């Protein structure tokens, strides 16, 4: 019920938001294609992925990621391409988009704006963010917020 919630409609809307957040987290930790999990994944790749996940909201360059992984940028680029089919920067963008999606689902409850979320997730250009978001999730960022706001 809505006993512990300040507003009954908020309780009704929280369920779907929390369910999708849990599914997103499970997908992210289940070792899907983005994680590149497997016995042959180089340590430098794993270190780079972890660094990106921890620091995704910060300004990052390829050199920063390579340094954290203990390899040269070209070596890291090749490892990402070979194991994930992505560049390190494309992987960073996907991690940031996943963070933004989670934040946008929560925005239905917190009232944060799309611009706030995009900026907090490391996107400098709102129109580029919106286009990338739509390409990845099939809906605009504002649609995600509305969908979870209305349940």
Predicted segments, located by residue:
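Residues within the DNA-recognition helix of helix-turn-helix
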Residues: 79, 132
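Alpha-helical bundle regulatory/interaction domains
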Residues: 1-57, 61-73, 82-87, 102-127, ...
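Generic hydrophobic, amphipathic alpha-helix propensity
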Residues: 44-45, 92-97
């Amino acid at each position: 019920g809505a006993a512990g919630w300040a507003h009954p409609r908020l309780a009704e809307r929280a369920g779907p938001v929390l369910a999708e957040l849990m599914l997103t987290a499970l997908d992210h930790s289940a070792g899907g294609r983005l994680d590149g999990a497997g016995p042959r994944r180089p340590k430098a790749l794993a270190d780079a992925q972890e660094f990106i996940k921890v620091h995704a909201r910060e300004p990052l360059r390829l050199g920063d990621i390579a340094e954290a992984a203990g390899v040269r940028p070209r070596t890291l680029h090749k490892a990402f391409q070979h194991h994930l089919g992505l560049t390190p920067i494309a992987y960073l963008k996907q991690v940031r988009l996943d963070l933004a999606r989670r934040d946008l689902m929560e925005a239905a409850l917190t009232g944060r704006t799309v611009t706030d979320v995009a900026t907090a997730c490391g996107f400098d250009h709102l129109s580029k963010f919106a286009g990338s978001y739509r390409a990845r999730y099939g809906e605009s960022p504002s649609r995600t917020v509305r969908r979870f706001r209305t349940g």
